[in-house]
Amino acid sequence: MKKSLDHLPPRKQAELRQVVETVRAAFEEAVFSRRADRLKNGKILKIILYGSYARGDWVHDPVGRYFSDYDLLIIVDHEDLTDYEFWREAENRTMPVGPDIRTPVSLIVHALDDVNDQLDRGRYFFADIVREGGVVAAALVRLSRAVDKERGREPSQRQ
């Protein structure tokens, strides 16, 4: 997984930072008034950019009216936090209608346990994200034993 998004132009980097801040703020508002600790104390563990912007082959074609979107995998600490009710406002706020965010944004949300399970099962979609994606925001959390095996480490050697 890439640790830098330096291949993106400065304007795209700034826009992506704004997207991340917007997503985080909307999520914090969505969990703020919850009573259950697992929801009230819910956390975004990682936000990973994948797809064309992560690979560096995005399209910006005003003539053909085609524009690549930011594909973001959001990893949360509890399965219940993947429910759409927590992300509706984040999606609304990241629509490309204002001067701060002009690129379409596509969010998918999975719990860490689910992502690790998908990686352990060798699901291509998740394996591609780990291989090609770039971490936009992260807490100190590791993904799957499958990633460790790919890198020649035993799970007990995780940092």
What are these regions (language model features)?
Residues L72:
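Conserved RNP beta-strands of RNA recognition motif
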